[in-house]
Amino acid sequence: MSRVANNPITVPKGVEVTLGDGIAVKGPLGSMSQPMSSDVTVALNDGVLTFAPVGSSIQANAMAGTLRALVNNMVQGVSKGFERKLTLVGVGYRAQAQGDALNLSLGFSHPVVHKMPAGIKVETPTQTEIVIKGIDRQAVGQVAADVRAYRPPEPYKGKGVRYSDEVVIKKETKKK
């Protein structure tokens, strides 16, 4: 059995899990659902979710671990939420949140406007910091990666958009 699927998920107070054709999770921050694989059986007993593969195939084991990880992310998302912080490094690089869009000045001849998908909120505490929040871990990470892709950190001066916890390894300039 998958080592990930061996760990049961304890459902926190205020979070409601419903099993049916799929798994629906409802909490204080919102609700999410995930279709269930026929290779995995899910049981809910006294606020504890357990996952077990049907049969002993490699695919069933893998699906059990994958489904457990996805459901755990859903439970965390609807109870606490997820956030990703980005930092802008460079002269004149600025960010400004306007409703459901993010306005970026990244040294191009035009401002870059990035629309946020449904369920994702963006804040700019300062002009060089961006905080992306939401209940869907995958969507938060994808939006952060999309924003970073406009101007990834370059290896000589480190200018660009980077994750706040990212370490940019700088190269030495060419010597004569």
Curated annotation (Swiss-Prot):
> Can the keyword Ribonucleoprotein be found in this entry's annotation?
yes
Q: Which GO terms describe its biological process?
A: cytoplasmic translation
- Specify one Pfam family: Ribosomal_L6
Quaternary assembly: Part of the 50S ribosomal subunit.
- Write down what this protein is called: Large ribosomal subunit protein uL6
Single annotated GO MF:
structural constituent of ribosome
Stated role:
This protein binds to the 23S rRNA, and is important in its secondary structure. It is located near the subunit interface in the base of the L7/L12 stalk, and near the tRNA binding site of the peptidyltransferase center.
Gene from which this protein is expressed: rplF
Its keywords, alphabetically, are: Ribonucleoprotein, Ribosomal protein, RNA-binding, rRNA-binding
Q: Which GO terms describe its cellular component?
A: cytosolic large ribosomal subunit
Keyword RNA-binding on entry: yes
**Gene3D superfamilies according to UniProt:** Ribosomal protein L6, alpha-beta domain
Regarding protein family, the annotation reads: Belongs to the universal ribosomal protein uL6 family.
Matching entries from InterPro entries are given as: Ribosomal_uL6-like (IPR000702), Ribosomal_uL6-like_a/b-dom_sf (IPR036789), Ribosomal_uL6_a/b-dom (IPR020040), Ribosomal_uL6_bac-type (IPR019906), Ribosomal_uL6_CS (IPR002358)
